[in-house]
């Protein structure tokens, strides 16, 4: 049994930066979306005033997000273990830098959550109830906000994966033509992405479809 290891300081920093990045995105969306919604019933002159007032804030929020992204990249690039894990994770089609960063944080750089089924359960995408001799509650439990971020990111990853020509796209289209519930099929794709991430990390080699078993 692997003993629990507290997150290294650099992982704690990544966690903080990731959370700040998410807040910036949320504030940006809160400010930008209402402006778009108002276009249908607000006069043109008022629209221009609102846009001018909000533009500087929106630009500042975007700049803040870019600055956070740069800090995250610098931390990962400056740490040998994190850089290696990051490169392995983003090699999986459909998995981007933000998802990889969140995975590193949530799993304590793949030390605390070493089982893909457990990660799927923590991320809220497991098509089953995970059970084992060790409770999923406790020191390895991911915070509620982190769970929401992971689930959202894996949803975006699945949406990206089904647009990429290959095994996952074929599987999604085949199941759809069979009349399967699209959300259930999409959830299976989310779960598959997690398993592929853990597979490449275990092998220590970037994604290669010839090494991995096909979707059921």
Give residue ranges: language-model regions.
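Long, charge-rich intrinsically disordered scaffolds of nucleic-acid metabolism proteins
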Residues: 1-88
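Short helix-capping/linker segments at secondary-structure and domain boundaries
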Residues: 1-2, 108-112, 161-167, 195-209
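Short, solvent-exposed helix-loop connector elements
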Residues: 2-15, 43-46, 138-141, 170-187
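Short alpha-helical "patches" and their helix-cap loops
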Residues: 4-13, 115-122, 167-177, 203-216
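Short coil/turn segments at secondary-structure boundaries
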Residues: 5-6, 35-37, 75, 132-135, ...
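Non-catalytic, well-ordered alpha-helical scaffold segments
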Residues: 18, 22-25, 29, 55, ...
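Phosphate-backbone recognition surface of nucleic-acid-processing proteins
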Residues: 91, 97, 101-182
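Low-complexity, acidic/Ser/Thr- and charged residue-rich accessory regions of DNA metabolism proteins
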Residues: 134-138, 171-216
């Amino acid at each position: 049994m692997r003993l629990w290891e507290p997150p290294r300081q650099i992982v704690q920093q990544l966690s903080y930066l990731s959370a700040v990045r998410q807040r910036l995105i949320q504030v940006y969306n809160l400010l930008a979306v209402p402006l778009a919604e108002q276009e249908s019933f607000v006069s043109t002159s008022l629209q221009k005033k609102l846009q001018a007032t909000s533009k500087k804030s929106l630009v500042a929020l975007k700049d803040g997000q870019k600055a956070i992204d740069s800090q995250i990249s610098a931390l990962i690039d400056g740490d040998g273990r994190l850089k290696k894990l990051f490169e392995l994770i983003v090699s999986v089609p459909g998995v981007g830098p933000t998802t990889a960063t969140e995975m590193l944080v949530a799993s304590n750089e793949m030390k605390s959550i070493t089982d893909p089924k457990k990660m799927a359960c923590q991320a809220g995408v497991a098509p089953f109830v995970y059970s084992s001799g060790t409770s999923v509650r406790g020191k390895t439990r991911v915070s509620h906000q982190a769970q929401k971020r992971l689930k959202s990111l894996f949803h975006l990853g699945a949406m990206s994966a089904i647009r990429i020509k290959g095994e996952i796209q074929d599987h999604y289209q085949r199941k759809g033509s069979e009349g399967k519930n699209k959300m259930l099929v999409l959830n299976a794709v989310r779960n598959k992405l997690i398993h592929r991430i853990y597979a490449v990390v275990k092998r220590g080699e970037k994604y290669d479809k010839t090494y991995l078993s096909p979707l059921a």
